[in-house]
Amino acid sequence: MKVRTSVKKICSSCKVIRRKGVIGVICTNPKHKQRQA
């Protein structure tokens, strides 16, 4: 899990999601998981 100020899709299977106002990226590759700080 990476915490970043700006979250971006890294590959084609990355999805930008919003949960309770928190923007994040979920992917099949665990290295691509991101959350916005």
UniProtKB/Swiss-Prot annotation:
Work out whether the entry's keyword set contains Ribonucleoprotein: yes
Provide the disulphide bond pattern.
none
Q: Which GO terms describe its cellular component?
A: cytoplasm; ribonucleoprotein complex; ribosome
Xref: SUPFAM superfamilies: Ribosomal protein L36
Q: Name one Pfam family in it.
A: Ribosomal_L36
Q: Which GO terms describe its biological process?
A: translation
InterPro entries to which the protein is assigned, alphabetical: Ribosomal_bL36, Ribosomal_bL36_sp
- Keywords from the UniProt entry: Ribonucleoprotein, Ribosomal protein
From which domain of life does this come?
A: Bacteria
Q: Does the keyword Ribonucleoprotein apply?
A: yes
Query: What terms describe the molecular function in GO for this protein?
Result: structural constituent of ribosome
Q: Where is the signal peptide?
A: none
Q: Which NCBIfam families match?
A: rpmJ_bact
Per the similarity annotation, which family is this? Belongs to the bacterial ribosomal protein bL36 family.
Q: What is this protein called?
A: Large ribosomal subunit protein bL36
